[in-house]
Design a protein with these regions (language model features):
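Flexible phosphate/Mg2+-sensing switch loops adjacent to catalytic phosphate-binding sites
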Residues: 76, 108-144
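Hydrophobic anchor at the beta1->P-loop junction of P-loop NTPases
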Residues: 86-88
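A conserved segment at the C-terminal end of the G1
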Residues: 98-109
Length: 370
């Protein structure tokens, strides 16, 4: 695929609802809404070449929808034109919020990358939950505000290469799990997505808990997911078909297996595959020059695909690959090592995430920015 351009910017960066041509709110002109677009898109012109509606007062391209008061009350402005929208889906136990927090932390440590967390929600989330992550406690599900509008955790990551700017935006929204079709179908960001990441909990793979116990590997008890991972991919496909038809097939899908530290601790990894939780990392997808190693990436992806097939997730793999033209697989650990659990007492590992950025490296390569 070539570089992804989102033009015109036709959705609200907070609720991801489609913005009508003549009804939007300009945050630079507070109190003067709805604004009137000065350029009307021509339906006979291909989407990529239509004029973008501008604020008639200040000419800004930053637009927020008028359908939700909470959108207009947000001050932590997310980049108006993200280079790519990445939707992250999965069951509640897959750790989506933890994953997002660790991605932000990882980007913050990279040289030449500007990370601006303009939302107090990110700081509050870190203060309230980071120590719980380090203690391997089970976090509460992300909650909605009283006004029923999701809290937004956003950051800007601008990486310059060849005079190009790459902007990644992350939002964390509550209760948006993939096992309920009705709920999934209402996720507007899924239909704005240029890429989709589906997180799977290793401990919820069929028979995995029993396999770990057979090898005397203890793990924190968690509520079992009532439905199979196959339901998640079915619902994602169903929602995309409902909203986008055949266009949804072109969205690259990444399937990530979370909590891989347990697989390494139990010596369940494919031969020669290790992300470094219990030894040397043999699967780095970036070469010595910081470029994506396609050969290594494809090898890793095939090994994780085979791992899922061998652990009774063949239907999930087959359904994903029948619908999506591009499917990639990866394994990661937000903790970096499995916690020690004895007599119900959890001894936390050093918090050192591993391979959480792999799909983002692929995405940046896809956009010719890596």
């Amino acid at each position: 695929m070539g570089k992804m351009y989102r033009y015109p910017h036709d959705y609200c960066p907070y609720c991801y609802h489609k913005i009508e041509t003549y009804s939007f709110y300009c945050p630079k002109c507070a109190g003067q809404h709805p604004e009137t677009a000065i350029i009307q898109p021509d339906k006979n012109i291909p989407l990529d070449y239509r004029g973008i509606p501008l604020c008639s007062n200040c000419g800004s391209v930053m637009r927020i929808c008028c359908s939700n008061d909470a959108c207009r009350n947000q001050n932590n402005i997310i980049p108006p034109e993200p280079t790519a929208v990445v939707a992250i889906a999965g069951f509640s136990s897959s750790g989506k919020s933890t994953y997002l927090l660790d991605v932000v932390a990882s980007k913050s440590s990279e040289t030449g990358v500007l990370v601006s967390a303009k939302s107090h929600a990110l700081i509050e989330w870190r203060e309230q939950n980071l120590h719980r992550i380090q203690q391997s406690d089970v976090l509460d599900s992300t909650q909605k505000h009283a006004d029923n509008f999701s809290s937004v955790v956003g950051f800007q990551s601008v990486a310059k290469k060849d005079c190009e700017e790459i902007i990644l935006s992350l939002t964390d929204r509550p209760g948006e799990e993939s096992q309920e079709m009705e709920r999934l179908a209402s996720l507007n960001y899924l239909f704005c997505a240029d890429y989709i990441i589906l997180l799977l909990d290793l401990l919820n793979l069929p028979g995995m808990s029993e396999e770990l116990r057979a090898k005397d590997i203890d793990f924190p008890q968690q509520e079992a997911t009532a439905q199979s991972n196959e339901i998640a991919i079915e619902n994602i496909i169903g929602a995309l078909e409902q909203q986008q038809g055949k266009k949804g097939k072109k969205i690259p899908l990444f399937i990530g297996v979370a909590k891989w530290d347990y697989a390494e601790k139990a010596d369940l990894c494919p031969l020669g595959f290790s992300i470094g939780c219990e030894g040397a990392d043999t699967t780095a997808v970036l070469d010595a020059k910081g470029r994506l190693d396609k050969k290594r990436w494809n090898l890793n992806s095939n090994l994780i695909r085979n791992f899922l097939m061998q652990h009774n997730e063949g239907n999930l793999v087959n359904k994903a690959e029948r619908y999506f033209k591009t499917v990639n697989y990866y394994a990661f650990s937000c903790f970096g090592a499995a916690p020690q659990v004895k007599s119900g007492i959890v001894t936390p590992p050093i918090h050192h995430p591993r391979h959480i950025m792999d799909p983002f490296y692929w995405i940046m390569k896809d956009m010719h920015a890596l």
